[in-house]
Amino acid sequence: MMKSRAWGWVLGGVLACLPVALTGAERFGDIEISLETMPVSQPRRGYQTLIARMANRDTKKKHGVRLVLQGPEHGVIALREVSRQVEVGAGAQMSMLLPVPLGLPSTFQSCAVEVDGYQEGELSIVLNLGAMRSGVHGAALSSPEFLVSQRVSRDALRVAVGTSRSGFSRSGPAMVGSLGQPAVLSLAERTIEAWPGRWSAYSAYDVVVITDLEWRTAPESVRDALWRHAECGAVLAVIGDSFVPPVACRTLEQSPAVGNATAGLVRFTIYEAGLGRCAVFGGSGPTISRRGMSRIINHSQRSLQEVWERVSSASNAHSLAPVLKKVRTPLGLSFIVLAIFALVAGPINLMVLRRKNRGIWLFWITPVLGLATSLMVIASVLFGEGLKPLARIEGMTILDERAGRATTIGINGFYCPLRPRKGLAYSYDTEVTACLVDTYGMGTKASPRELVWDEQQHLRKEWVAPRVPQYFRLRTSELRKERLGLLRDGSQLAVVNGLGVTIERLVLVDFDGTVYEVTDIPEGDQVSVGGPAALVLPRLSAMSDVILRREQWKTDERDNLPSSGLLRPGTYLAYLEGAPFVPNGLQRSAKTTEASVVFGILREEAQP
């Protein structure tokens, strides 16, 4: 059994040691490596995770191992290299995750293995990361992709989903669904005890299906990862009555038991899990509710696929959060410099040299003047719009203070006069989706984009081109300590701003349903909320509808969030002066415009 370790503590994503012999491994010096991939049939978004299981047969010396996926030098390639390096202790066994971003036109056919800086050989692997995303709103949605655990009945799931008998087809060691079906079903190659403990490892799947017994026996890190995956917009489907959600959730739909004594009774309950769903299927028979399964397929298409396909191109992302409304290229100054050069290098130069009887100097003075003019033009362009990059950071966060967890949907927009020397850096808990120009990366030459997994995920080389606005869609789930403190003194209520930045506007719904509204709360300050506000709460809406589908956190719509149906007793909306929960790939090296909204879920015993 794998020794579990909380994935949030291990920035490298390294799994625990495996006290069993590696099967199907290849040897590279003292290191044995076996490589497997999590099955993905539709490479559209998220990451396809490679799992490298390593063993160091040298009991006296540790070794540094680096795995490098390299694409071809030519062709329609948007990502050239993905790499990661870890250290394998003397006599140790371990597993390493190597996530590869999907939805980019890229292909990898081998994985180079370097041990202590020397290439020892290659592992054979075939990865097709997909075609360029269209970003066309209204295009036909693809079938949701299911990851199915080994204990789930394939026949029962196939009937519930509505696939034909080819709903599962053999593809190598994994059972992969046929395209054109209501859903694509991919069977996990290993038991749930060996599944990755990072939520982003499941980001390519719309639905993960397990049994209640598997939930109980899974390592804590795997349970945590699956629940975070659901909170980021996906679906966790559990077969079995004994499952209980790890946090209190609103019930969206509950079906009574239907069926007969012969076939058995079936029922289902669908909970709201952050931006996603948790569906529990129970009953006394072996069947699974088709009605309940159709509900989660509908959610997957409407709340996740539709959103990502709508905003996957740079033009659509620019309309959501424009980083630059107008390029400030100093063309007038450049033309003036060129006109002065033509005048000085031409008639004035000839006249002066003729008067001094130095006509032969024309052959070195003219090139010098040309070089000086070129430098002046370059300087006018660079300093005319500045050398400092511009960044636009926006997003919305669901801050569940009961669990200390923040789920964020956001966007990064960058405009860089010069390519960032260090590239972009994001945490391991952040899913990064590049919003590419539709024709970018096409042609005969491969793009030099590289992804390096070290202490963070580093996007290097041409992820951000000079003087071209570039956008990245983000999903992240992380542990956070920030919260809004409540202080009660009899009938008086005060709030303490523990969110890290100034709150420009706060709409708070107390546990008894009373609505309060406060403005301008500096970081760390305590402010009395005063009397109840006049806001009447509308009928509740699902968080996924407000935040994902309608994206009411956009600049021109965020003021309407209090009347969107999002607020309920024990929650609040905080309009922040900055964006402390939204990752910034350029970090502090850019001139940044930030804005964000937090939807907070309070704890009953909330105190500062």
Enumerate the language-model features and the residues they cover:
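Short acidic, flexible loop segments centered on an aromatic residue
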Residues: 60-75, 505-514
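Short alpha-beta junction capping motif
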Residues: 202-246, 272-281
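A glycine-centered loop/beta-turn motif at secondary-structure junctions
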Residues: 204-205, 234-235, 257-347
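Accessory, solvent-exposed terminal regions and/or long lumenal/extracellular loops of proteins
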Residues: 327, 406-608
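Internal/C-terminal transmembrane anchor helices
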Residues: 360-383
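Alpha-helical transmembrane signal-anchor/signal-peptide segments
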Residues: 381-403
